Amino acid sequence: MSVSRRTFLANSALTLTAAKIMPREWKLTPQTPAISASNRNKPYGSGYFGEWIQDEFDLPAFRYTCNQLKDPKAATDVNPGVLASTEHIHQIGNDRLTAIASNYGHVRVRQDEGAPKFLNDYAPERGCFAGGFGYLTDGTSVLSTLYPGNGDTFERLFGVGYFRKKVSGRGYTVDQVIFAPFGDDPALVSQVTIANNGSAEANLRWIEYWGCQMYQFSFRAFMELYAGKNVHEARRDFATRFQHHFRPASGGSGLRESKEFLGRDPAEDRVFQGVVALFGKSPDVFLTPPDPKAPKDANFDDLNPPATFLVSLDAPASGMTTNGKGFFGSGGADHPAGLARELDGDLGQTGPESALLLERKLRLKPGESRTLTFLYGYEVAGTDLESLITKYRRRASSALRESSDQWKRHGLRFSTPEEPWVEREVTWNHYYLRSGFTYDDFFHQHIISQASIYQYVMGFQGAARDPLQHALPFLFSDPDLVKEVLRYTLSEVRPNGSLPYGIVGHGMPMPTSSDNSSDMPLWLIWAVSEYVFATRDVHFLDSETLTRYGESAGRASVRNLLARCYRHLTEDVSTGEHGLMRMLQDDWNDALVNAWTTKAEAKEVVEKSESVLNSAMAAYVFDRYARMLTYAGADDSLTAPIRQKVEDHRRAVRAQWTGQWFRRTWLGPTNGWLGEKCIWIEPQPWAILGGSADEQQTRTLISNIDRELRQVSPIGAIQLSQGSDQVQRGAWHSEPGMQSNGGVWPSLNQTLIWALAGIDGAMAWDEWKKNSFARHAEVYPEVWYGTWSGPDVLNSALSKQPGATTGGTPFGWTDFPVLNMHTHACPLFALSKLIGLDFIESGVSLAPKLPLASFRFETPLLGLIKSSDGYEGWYDPMISNTHSIRLKLPAEEAKNFSRIEINGKRMPARMVDGALEMRGQGGAGTALRWSVRK
């Protein structure tokens, strides 16, 4: 059965109708929920589904308390495939892998080498139950760490790096912790502490289960939607084309599983080739045929996936089997038939229901407990499995505490006594962002995908701008990780300086019309410039990167690749009749062509459209680029033309001032301007940051942003004000207040906070708090996502379902409404702007306008502490040198301080451009330390 592209889009998550008119100013009304009664005795920001606590490691954790089997509030409309309607998930991960832990107790592990995938699918109808749980039996009674567990109580804790489940009943307690050890090891540790609460000695068996049937996030399968295929079933059918092979591991203490590819199903291959031919004959508004010039080693799917293993660390296994079908039998995961007997030692299974099952026998006296430890993971090419197993055998009892200690020592921290919950939120965001890293062996770099619906449902890593934004907070703590993300993106640069919109599978450029985007190189130039300024690592510019795309792919220096990107922006993308950078198929907003114009108009729009956003951003980025090159030793002959482009873009943006705000986009002669009658948030902050707006325009603009975009929303500024611009005529359609038709986007509000921070610190701080998980949980406590993680866009108060995100068929944002890295990265980077931080040629400029009596911004690179005594801080870039610290304070505040110290020595005050300047030696591990006191 086939389905037309029009029907597909008409039924997609972007196809929504009807409008909801809400009050102009945000206030509590019958349509806008107040804090629920269940919230009143919980820490701020807990919401309905549990509460925030401080765990035994002095780290934040979320105690999940909802019984999703009985509570109707747990249900979300989803398309079956990845998450169930009542499934709420938590991320555990390290730099190598990421796993999703379910409120049902199971854990799926994502692994990206070869192609992004779950190593252990959850598809109970196919006999696949993910993993990370087990069964305790004394021959009569059974407890399970798969919810509800057959006990009297079942506790669930989402922690930094771990997922804890504690089930009690039948005279026993099982406390299982699944954690990803901090670092780069491709493994999870499962620690199971079993206690005998009865009055008699107990002979017990524990069976640890991890599945081994893959679920690849295949974009090839996603493309087959156009042929009427179910993407999730297509992916699961593809997994059956692999045969499993098992053998004992580590001297018989565990199991090793490998896979053999049997070839593609010929019928499926014909379907895919038909879809490709269809796109070739009849261009689609979103998808295109695959790039015929893609590298030979690129592939939509992983045809040689890694081996997986499960090992008992603290003692040999008492038994094992790979016969998952025989173990679960007709009782399934709730009542496995195999619990009635010892595991049979069968390692001959090859089918999709094969599994890794280990048994441990133990005898416990009354009141006695024992901890069993297992290691589950996958083999990285060129590494030794036995060495990894030995490492964790030695560290089994201490690995969780050691990992937690590492999490406490890394990352960005911010705290203020006036808002205690902020410290928790910042620590949590850093954890989620860092644990979102994986490793891509096509580019040979760590990468932080946007994830969420894009990776887990649609199957692509993109857009190219997104990992660059996610990496920015690590400038302050882990510059080597930033360099990996930069190298990943630099490797994507094509001979003409463009970048693929996204990557699917193993290095395959995403086949999409959005590949003809205009803005991607801007983000790369900006991110590299920020890296060089923050770390002083000018040598990075002369390091070489292996590019992967185009006939002239090969080694090139970072400096030359940036120049290639700049030429692409200025010569290929170029400018239109209004002097603004052209938009092409899209700028940041992927929907402008497909939602606001008809298919018949699209050719003109792509050729003639211009983006105020692109030019406003280019004015900032090109200026930053020129200054960075000058700092790195470039002469004026190279930078003067770039500075001229800065002025050209500023002038073009200034011409788009309406008297109230800046226009959004020129859609060509037929459609004219967007943004004359409505304010679009996208270009406004960049117009301020890039120097396009003068002082009076800035005041007017901030006032209108506050009134039109901020005051109407309790959870962050909306992207587009109400009005005629919300009328969409294209193939994609979204309801007002949703998606790119006025939703709430953290990635946009990050830039707004940055712009506000230099003008109105109180408004900037308020906007930061409104975009927090804590605020969302207070305003919309019964929407589970948005409490500890969230999507890249939330519905605004102007929508029918405020505080939620978009549903729809055949896929919707509600299908995977968490783990979007923008929700974690953007608040972190915005904090650096709230303290007025700017890296300049001579060092650091700080202009804090936060309305807080005291706060602490602490990172390995840079710190700023405000107290009743004054300010102090440090700066420790990679390169040791004499650096300048400029502290700009309001005159009334500055006059209170007379004592200045640099590296422990008192120095006289020196004013430069209205700021106190302090100069001293620092870097390469010895920080420049300074203080300004009364």
What are these regions (language model features)?
Residues H446-M458, Y501-D519, R548-S552, H578-E607, ...:
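Carbohydrate-binding/catalytic loop surfaces
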Residues Y162-F163, K608, A616-M617:
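Hydrophobic, small-residue-rich alpha-helical packing segments that form membrane-like cores
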Residues I21-D466, D480, Y488, E530-A534, ...:
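Anionic coordination/interaction segments
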